[in-house]
Amino acid sequence: MALYEHVFLARQDASPQQVEELTAQMTGIVEGLGGKVTKTENWGVRSLTYRMNKNRKAHFVLLNIDAPSAAIAEIERQERISEDVIRYLSVRVEELEEGPSAMMRKADRDRERDDRGGGFRGEREGGFRGDREGGFRGGDRDGGGFRGDRGPRRPREEAETATDGE
């Protein structure tokens, strides 16, 4: 039998229970056709790179499958029919990855960073804001100097002349 990594995206408004039911349904199909699901990972709700079927987020689920190609064809057929599945992808691999996938390792790494307790650092002494302190604050990059063929800048009108029209 062949080894596959199968990922599907479920709608963001599907509850976690519905996603678990979809996963169980896919597992049942594989086992019914003589295969087995060796690993299931729910990556949770993640933002999509672009909108798919009017969804900006989706539940991501990974299945590592050891099954005949007929089982994969049936899973994909069922996912095309299901309204809860936005996208899916099956990739045949030489060997299945042991342990957590790269996405789960990344999630663990991010969780460890959050545990460091960075949080709000409070006010900085003297209001220091990097290289902006005491330097030029906005406007032209050259400070209003030479403007090439555009000629000199006209003086600004005072605020009083702008309100005279009322």
Curated annotation (Swiss-Prot):
The keyword Ribosomal protein applies. GO terms for biological process: translation. One of its GO terms (cellular component) is cytosolic small ribosomal subunit. Keywords: Ribonucleoprotein, Ribosomal protein, RNA-binding, rRNA-binding. InterPro entries: Ribosomal_bS6, Ribosomal_bS6_sf, Ribosomal_S6_plastid/chlpt, Transl_elong_EF1B/ribsomal_bS6. The keyword Chaperone does not apply. Residues 97-166 are annotated as: Disordered. Pfam families: Ribosomal_S6 (PF01250). Binds together with bS18 to 16S ribosomal RNA. Belongs to the bacterial ribosomal protein bS6 family. This is Small ribosomal subunit protein bS6. It comes from Bradyrhizobium diazoefficiens (strain JCM 10833 / BCRC 13528 / IAM 13628 / NBRC 14792 / USDA 110). The lineage of its organism: Bacteria, Pseudomonadati, Pseudomonadota, Alphaproteobacteria, Hyphomicrobiales.
